[in-house]
Amino acid sequence: MTLTLIIAAFLGTLAALLLKPLRASAHCDTMEGPTAQDGLRSLETGDPAPALKWVGPADENELREVFEQALAARDLGPAARSVAERWFIENLVRIHRAGEGAPYSGVQPYGTPVDERVAAADAAIASGDLAPLEGLVPADRWAELQRRFAAALDRKDYDTSDVDAGRAYIETYVSFFKYAEGEDHEHGEHHALAHAQHQH
């Protein structure tokens, strides 16, 4: 029954998304992006914490329910595993995007290109150095970019079992990415406050 419901829900979502034009720029909307990768990590380990940090407290129960159903369905065979994983990732990204006040148009496949500033911001976070973004962000925005970058790095090494600490990191992480992409609003305005606390 669980698998049937998951397949029906997934096919319904897929049909709706096929009617929309694909976009190839949103960081958290790609299978290679951090949101989807954390979702897969949660499914592989059976620990929901990596995925939960991308959604606010108000949406936690919804994601936990989807997570438990996906875990159960994955044990029913290879085909069920693939459908369940995709269904969970679709829901994770959808809920995350809604928390940002952003539209959801599906999860883009592996290999989908992203904005060069997004790729550079990823490299900066990974290396702990803003050098990859040099020349991509206007000089008059550099000081604020440095501030947001420092805030993200300060919260990067958190206890991965602490969902609240993970959310605090994601708030600074996405704020940095949004600014690197040229957007001025704080991530928290759309994500943290929308969920009474806080999670590309």
Where are these regions (language model features)?
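C-terminal segment of classical bacterial N-terminal signal peptides
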Residues: 12-23
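Feature marks short, highly hydrophobic, charge-poor N-terminal signal-anchor/signal peptide-like helices
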Residues: 1-8
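N-terminal Sec/ER secretory leader and immediately downstream segment
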Residues: 24-89, 94
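A generic short-segment signal for beta-strand/edge and adjacent turn/coil regions
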Residues: 7, 19-20, 101-102
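Extended amphipathic alpha-helical interaction segments
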Residues: 89-162, 166, 170-200
